[in-house]
Amino acid sequence: MRNLVFLLPIVFVMSCTSDVAEDSVTWADTDITFHNEMMACTAGTDFSQDSVNAMMSEYRSLLNNEDLVGAWGYIPASAENRFDNGWWELSWTSKEAANAGWSEWNSNPDAQAWSEKHANVMECDVEGRSSWTFVWTYDPYAFGEFEKVTGSFASDFAPCSLNEGKSFDDFKVAINDYIAWLESLDREEFSQAYAYGLYLPQDENGELPTSNFNFWWGNFHQSFESMLQGNNAW
């Protein structure tokens, strides 16, 4: 399933201090935000690497919306995963762009024919999709670009919550400390692509809550080997 990326859950622990050098890279230097959607997916009776490759090839030919900036599939890489199903992720420039994109997709006869044709390969819960504000707080290409031939990479996701009495501003300080640690790594030793992003919840208006919320942290590595290297360094 070369065109899909993989999930591997870990417990993510961050140790933070409040000292950040004035000339270091911080959250505010990047702060690139998108509207991301997640859909739970289940494999059908015709699920195989070949059938998925064919399905994805046709899917890419249907994409012509410039506001859809990314689409990824995830399958479990371990029996110990938090979820035994797969996931489909879409990244849009905004919530409004996502709504317009879905309206266009649902009215496209070719898109509907594609969905029906491959229903036995993979079925995704479109109506039950969840929405998140996705934030790159650090340059996703700081460690280089991800391999593009297969498009696969290794990822892990961790559920997070703010500690009691801590605010979102406190969290930003912690993020800046993590960025400072990333900046300290030897790029010759850590030469494979790595990026991370935050999946922040939205209220009914698509806005971020101000306190008492849970979120997801996503790590994206070029390979499971580089994931292990990074985890050991941390």
What are these regions (language model features)?
Residues L4-M14:
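Sec-dependent N-terminal signal peptides
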